């Protein structure tokens, strides 16, 4: 009698493929088998081609580290469990036309794998599923959530349509360095480092549905990117590294939330000896009113000790007694004290401050003139001029 090089198990009518011990390069799973057990083919270095026949479910790590496996036919498979084909470094072709669920890291580090089209039957997908693959185009516009690290490290990916997704998980496209187009028009949340080090991707517009942007979500953004009013949560360096200059447009109603992007603690008021510690400027903010009209311009700074508070914004708009401690340091660019004086200011420049009443605008102007004049006289008397 012929000795079989595999083991089957009958579990109440379900035929489960338990373990393969053969050395063939090509193998077809016997008819009637509907499940592949956990690690059934794992670490097989000879297998190159496999036909799963009637299999509906592929167990966890079933083919993990089958480093010479090149093609997999599984037209009836509905469930591919976690790590099923992880580290199959030679795998380039799979047929997944009926799949409904793919588990975490199922195809992670399949560095030659390119799936031309994802089946619309797919309703659930795990974290890191296609991380470090060679997929060039991803169209999964029906999924509402893009899981963590889904395509991270896929340097071949150039186009992604995730236009139905409400949630984009952290590092979902991190280090997809060739990605140039990503459609995410329904997104409400973009996770930390979602597009981190996507050097070719510069979003020109963010969706009106967006509410939060995580830390370091984008590597860079298009000049004058408009930040929607809906966004209330901004992560640290969410528009790119702190050492890279950016320019965005922000609505007045979002300015308080936006300020938290730069600063940690908000003072309730200014004291005479209050100091604000500033470093290199990193972002230019054009302020818009509800009709998209520009009302102000703020070059903001990283590493501020304090942030713009609601009380401060209210004072901008109405309070004539507010002490406008803002200095246009560019008025006297030749004075070396300019750089040192930045410890006393929040913003380098504020043009057309927020619909001030005429008296308040005059007070603001007089304050700037008198304060700068005192500083200039002090600099001259101390011979502190370039």
Question: What annotation goes with each model-predicted range?
Answer:
Residues 344-364:
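Repeat-mediated protein-protein interaction surfaces in helical alpha-solenoids
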Residues 1-14, 21-35, 45-57, 67-79, ...:
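Structural signature of tandem-repeat unit edges
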């Amino acid at each position: 009698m012929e000795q079989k090089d595999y083991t089957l198990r009958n579990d109440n009518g379900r035929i489960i493929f338990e373990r393969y011990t053969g050395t063939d390069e090509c193998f077809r799973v016997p008819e009637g088998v509907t499940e592949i057990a956990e690690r059934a083919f794992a670490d097989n270095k000879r297998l190159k081609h496999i036909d799963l026949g009637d299999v509906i479910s592929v167990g966890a790590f079933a083919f993990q580290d089958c480093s010479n496996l090149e093609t997999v036919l599984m037209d009836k498979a509905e469930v591919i469990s976690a790590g099923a084909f992880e580290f199959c470094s030679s795998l380039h072709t799979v047929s997944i036309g009926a799949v409904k669920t793919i588990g975490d890291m199922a195809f992670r580090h399949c560095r030659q794998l390119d799936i031309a089209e994802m089946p619309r039957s797919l309703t659930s997908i795990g974290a890191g599923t296609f991380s470090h693959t060679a997929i060039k185009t991803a169209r999964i516009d029906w999924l509402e959530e893009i899981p963590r690290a889904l395509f991270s490290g896929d340097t071949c990916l150039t186009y992604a349509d995730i236009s139905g997704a409400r949630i984009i998980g952290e590092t979902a496209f991190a280090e997809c360095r060739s990605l140039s187009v990503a459609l995410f028009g329904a997104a409400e949340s973009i996770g930390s480092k979602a597009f981190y080090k996507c050097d070719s991707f510069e979003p020109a517009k963010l969706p009106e549905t967006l509410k939060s942007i995580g830390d370091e979500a984008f590597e860079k953004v298009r000049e004058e990117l408009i930040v929607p009013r809906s966004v209330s949560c901004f992560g640290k360096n969410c528009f790119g590294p702190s050492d890279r200059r950016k320019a965005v447009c922000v609505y007045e109603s979002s300015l308080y939330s936006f300020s938290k992007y730069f600063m940690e603690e908000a003072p309730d008021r200014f004291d005479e000896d209050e100091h604000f510690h500033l470093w290199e400027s990193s972002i230019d903010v054009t302020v818009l009113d509800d009709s998209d009209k520009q009302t102000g311009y703020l070059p903001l700074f990283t590493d501020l000790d304090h942030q713009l508070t609601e009380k401060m914004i209210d004072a901008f708009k109405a309070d004539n007694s507010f002490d406008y401690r803002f200095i246009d340091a560019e008025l006297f660019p030749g004075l070396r004290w300019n750089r040192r004086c930045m410890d006393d200011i929040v913003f380098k420049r504020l043009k057309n401050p927020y619909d001030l009443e005429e008296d308040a605008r005059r007070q603001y102007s007089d304050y700037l003139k008198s304060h700068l004049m005192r500083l200039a006289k002090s600099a001259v008397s101390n011979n502190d001029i370039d």
